[in-house]
Amino acid sequence: MVREGNAESCFRMRLWCIAVLGLALLSACFIVSCVVTYYFTHGNTGKRLSELHTHHSNLTCFSEGTRVTEKIWGCCPGTWKPFGSSCYFISSEENFWAKSEQNCIGMGAHLVVINTETEQDFIIQQLNKTFSYFLGLSDPQGNGNWQWIDQTPYKENVRFWHQNEPNFSAEECASVVFWDGRGWGWNDVFCDSKRKSICEMKKIYL
């Protein structure tokens, strides 16, 4: 009976050791995961902030909810308009499409990419009906294969062309423009025509 008791005690001890070892391994994995997550989250955020500060003198941040223990802040350059996960800048200069994109890149952004109707509605509220504004949408080959500047898929269900547009293959760039009786909509235009433009960049989250 004593031997059986000792054997049972040894068996329980082994189980306990295995459980402790397993718990230790899980804890180690959790710690490593937290360190990696912190590095990528804060490291990338710091890098992005550094990049933005080379183009913009100040940032404006807005509370956008909370994590488990802290608030989430979404930040945009001071003169930019925040919406969703992006920041938008309406250029007052008129340039060719390529120059407009170059100017956006110089600010750490790109010509605007419109993904939803709510985004389109927000953007047109910021615009002057007198002007036409370049979008980050073009048809480089003039064959109807429209492409967004950031490689976002050109969605069939997210298009806001004016009626009967696009209608001319030589007009290989897109703009958003207000037409009397029709309101705001997209229009294909010559890329070397001069227009205002809209830049977009992702918010910085702190």
Swiss-Prot record:
Q: What is this protein called?
A: C-type lectin domain family 6 member A
- What residues bind Ca(2+) 2, as annotated? E165, N167, E171, N187, D188
In terms of InterPro entries, this protein maps to: C-type_lectin-like, C-type_lectin-like/link_sf, C-type_lectin/snaclec_domain, C-type_lectin_CS, CD209-like_CTLD, CTDL_fold
Query: Which segments constitute the C-type lectin domain?
Result: 83-200
Q: Please list the residues annotated as glycosylated.
A: N58, N128, N167
Residue ranges, Extracellular side: 37-206
The keyword Calcium is annotated on this UniProt entry: yes
- SMART domains for the chain: CLECT
Presence of keyword Metal-binding? yes
Q: TM segments? A: 16-36
**GO cellular component terms, A-Z:** external side of plasma membrane; plasma membrane
Major location, coarse class?
membrane
Expression (tissue specificity): Expressed at the highest levels in lymph nodes, at moderate levels in skin, small intestine, liver, and lung, and at lower levels in abomasum and spleen, but is not in the brain. Abundantly expressed by Langerhans cells compared to macrophages.
* UniProtKB keywords: Adaptive immunity, Calcium, Cell membrane, Disulfide bond, Glycoprotein, Immunity, Innate immunity, Lectin, Membrane, Metal-binding, Signal-anchor, Transmembrane, Transmembrane helix
Please give the biological process terms from Gene Ontology that the record holds. Answer: adaptive immune response; antifungal innate immune response; defense response to fungus; innate immune response; positive regulation of canonical NF-kappaB signal transduction; positive regulation of cytokine production; positive regulation of T-helper 17 type immune response
- Binding residues annotated for alpha-D-mannopyranose, in chain numbering: E165, P166, N167, E171, W179, N187, D188, R195
Species per Swiss-Prot/TrEMBL record: Bos taurus
The subunit structure is:
Associated with FCER1G. Heterodimer with CLEC4D; this heterodimer forms a pattern recognition receptor (PRR) against fungal infection.
The way this protein sits in the membrane is described as: Single-pass type II membrane protein
Residues that bind Ca(2+) 1: V113, N115, E119, E200
Compartment(s): Cell membrane
